[in-house]
């Protein structure tokens, strides 16, 4: 299963009072931007070869998703990969600027691990190509996590409605 989580563009943001939980109440108006997206793929199974989770099909043949060719001067992203301690999750993150965070701490990995606590999910491979700017306030990581929760619910027939998905998402934090 593959999708493109969009970022959000804030048209207006007013930071209100600080709450007792350390977060702030916000008054905001934003729109999703479908021009700036990451690429998220989740595959069920535990074959953790380097060609899993789209790596071979996306970059092995020097091509991108959608069969767009890389130009000669375009860089192939840097990959960072990890497998969870229980061996049920392999996550690969690709980013042109390099991956400068532990990938098992990525919100997509955290989303899988959170659902796995309650549902004992099958093994999966997650591939995330980060093209949205990291740390720019566009909510790319949160969108990736939300789509991960939704995709896992659909893939494994968990039947999580939007309210339950939002509850899980809130446990992951906010940006």
Question: Locations of the language-model features?
Answer:
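ATP-binding N-lobe of GHMP and related small-molecule kinases
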Residues: 1-136, 154, 158-163
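Ubiquitous "structural anchor" signal
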Residues: 69, 145-149, 165
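Short, small-residue alpha-helix embedded
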Residues: 142-156
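Alpha/beta catalytic cores of group-transfer enzymes, especially the acyltransferase/condensing modules
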Residues: 158-175
């Amino acid at each position: 299963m593959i999708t493109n989580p969009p970022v959000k563009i804030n048209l207006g943001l007013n930071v209100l009072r600080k709450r007792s939980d350390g977060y702030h109440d916000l008054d905001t108006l934003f729109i999703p931007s479908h021009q700036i997206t990451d690429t998220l793929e989740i595959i069920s199974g535990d074959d953790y070869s380097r060609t899993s989770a789209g790596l071979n099909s996306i970059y092995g043949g020097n091509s991108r998703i959608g069969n767009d060719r890389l130009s000669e001067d375009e860089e192939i992203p840097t990959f960072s990969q990890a497998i969870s301690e229980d061996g049920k999750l392999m996550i690969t993150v690709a980013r042109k600027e390099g991956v400068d965070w532990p990938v098992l701490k990525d919100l997509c990995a955290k989303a899988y691990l959170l659902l796995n606590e309650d549902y004992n999910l099958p093994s999966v491979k997650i591939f995330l190509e980060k093209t949205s700017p990291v740390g720019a306030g566009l909510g790319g990581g949160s969108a990736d996590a939300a789509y991960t929760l939704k995709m896992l619910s659909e893939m494994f027939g968990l039947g999580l409605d939007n309210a339950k998905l939002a509850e899980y998402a809130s446990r992951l934090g906010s940006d």
